């Protein structure tokens, strides 16, 4: 194998500048940069992924008459009330963690100080999703989880645009 060719391949692999001499010995040269640093740009808030989920959520809301169906079945099904209560508990704990603990009290790692808050929030949110699936199953059948997941992702991506 050719030594200059191997050095060139190594330089390209690790993005060394061509001026840097590659030595076989492990001598540290603090004044010489060892790799070219890439300038990282922050990701844009509105990208193809978030735009797709927001658009899909709008399309699902329009074509399946989501709010009309929700309004008609709200009082006739107790799964909505139970799911709504669980969703309220989940969002209350989440706002407590984000607004009160992180912003007001300044505890950035609240999951370390209060380790049970995140699993309780996750469990209540999943239980609320199951309740909403049971409540709307008689309307959309096996499409219900897909429609609710699309709505959920649209809301999450819309919230990510805000901040």
Swiss-Prot record:
Annotated GO CC locations = membrane
Superkingdom field: Eukaryota
Q: Does the keyword Membrane apply?
A: yes
Membrane topology of the entry? Multi-pass membrane protein
What this protein is called in its record is: Transmembrane protein 128
Q: Name one Pfam family in it.
A: TMEM128
Q: What is its main location?
A: membrane
Task: Report the subcellular localization.
Answer: Membrane
Q: Does the keyword Transport apply?
A: no
Q: Which residues cross the membrane?
A: 47-67, 79-99, 117-137, 142-162
Q: Keywords, A to Z?
A: Membrane, Transmembrane, Transmembrane helix
């Amino acid at each position: 194998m050719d030594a200059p060719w191997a050095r060139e391949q190594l330089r390209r692999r690790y993005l060394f500048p061509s001026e840097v001499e590659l030595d076989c010995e492990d001598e540290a040269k603090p004044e010489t940069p060892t790799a070219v640093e890439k300038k990282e740009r922050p990701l844009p808030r509105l990208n193809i992924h978030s735009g797709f989920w927001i658009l899909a959520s709008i399309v699902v809301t329009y074509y399946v008459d989501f709010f009309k169906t929700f309004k008609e079945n709200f009082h006739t099904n107790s799964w909505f009330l139970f799911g709504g209560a669980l969703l309220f508990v989940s969002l209350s704990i989440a706002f407590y963690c984000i607004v009160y603990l992180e912003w007001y009290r300044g505890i950035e790692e609240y999951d370390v100080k209060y380790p049970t808050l995140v699993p309780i929030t996750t469990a209540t949110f999943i239980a609320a999703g199951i309740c909403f699936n049971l409540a709307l199953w008689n309307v959309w059948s096996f499409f219900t989880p897909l429609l609710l997941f699309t709505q959920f992702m649209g809301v999450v991506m819309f919230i990510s645009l805000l901040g």
